[in-house]
């Protein structure tokens, strides 16, 4: 395995260094080829490294950054005041080639804006999208995007997301000729926003996309599609609703029947069922798939859930490792060239999808 270096915005997220630093040490234990640049306030980070051994310390470096992008700051405001923040410094390390990827649990809008400003979108991509790979009930995986980078999306952006999602599903997840669907409130052609209906018409005429139509949110985990495309507002709400339901379900499995007097054989049966069902559905635990890749950039950026615990943030670090090893930006760029000639974007003129040059 080739050595690689990641930049961590350790100050971001709801819990900051108290979660991100222990997660960094956990990631170092799991990967002997990994070096981490911990970006943040040295006075806060250093005490949290007290338990790190000599070998771990040899693969750690603290990069000073005294300020933090506020979680409630407007993206435009956060970008203007971003100089010297842990998020911006971490992204600059990627831009300068000192790190191969950035991981942050900070403000999503600010991360998207700064990443677009510093790392630049790929040719033919208007705006990057947050993407994750979710497990489904057929024991396969579904690529879902956008998960919150772009609240309002027009039809062209949705088509671009579909192209990127299909490339990711085929090149990284290993799904041949992946099925692509648009998330909508119904399967009928007349349902949904204008942008969704327009994107549907455009996708039907893109020969490189195996477009299968609309999919409703209740079928997200059924395995009916390999790529599910939506705007960032809808995607974020859908993902967090699903995460909440899964957490409640797993919690109920553990607590069901506690405090009630039962026969010994009923207690044994209950415990066996709890363990069996927990194993069966544990792959749906949100902590196990934390970390959304900001797809469509010339560099690798992973957005962790802001409320991630140590285990979940360590998973986000591993997501960054895999994205770098699989050369996700390079593969996306290479495939986009075969779909859109350099400097062009899709345009629906009523006769199918043509191409027009960026102005």
UniProtKB/Swiss-Prot annotation:
GO terms for biological process: fatty acid biosynthetic process; phospholipid biosynthetic process. It comes from the Bacteria. Homodimer. Probably interacts with PlsY. InterPro entries: FA_synthesis, Phospholipid_synth_PlsX-like. Catalyzes the reversible formation of acyl-phosphate (acyl-PO(4)) from acyl-[acyl-carrier-protein] (acyl-ACP). This enzyme utilizes acyl-ACP as fatty acyl donor, but not acyl-CoA. GO terms for cellular component: cytoplasm. Coiled coil: none annotated. It is found in: Cytoplasm. GO terms for molecular function: phosphate:acyl-[acyl carrier protein] acyltransferase activity. Belongs to the PlsX family. This is Phosphate acyltransferase. NCBIfam families: plsX. Its EC number is 2.3.1.274. It catalyses: a fatty acyl-[ACP] + phosphate = an acyl phosphate + holo-[ACP]. It comes from Salmonella heidelberg (strain SL476). Pathway: Lipid metabolism; phospholipid metabolism. Keywords: Cytoplasm, Lipid biosynthesis, Lipid metabolism, Phospholipid biosynthesis, Phospholipid metabolism, Transferase. Its main location: cytoplasm.
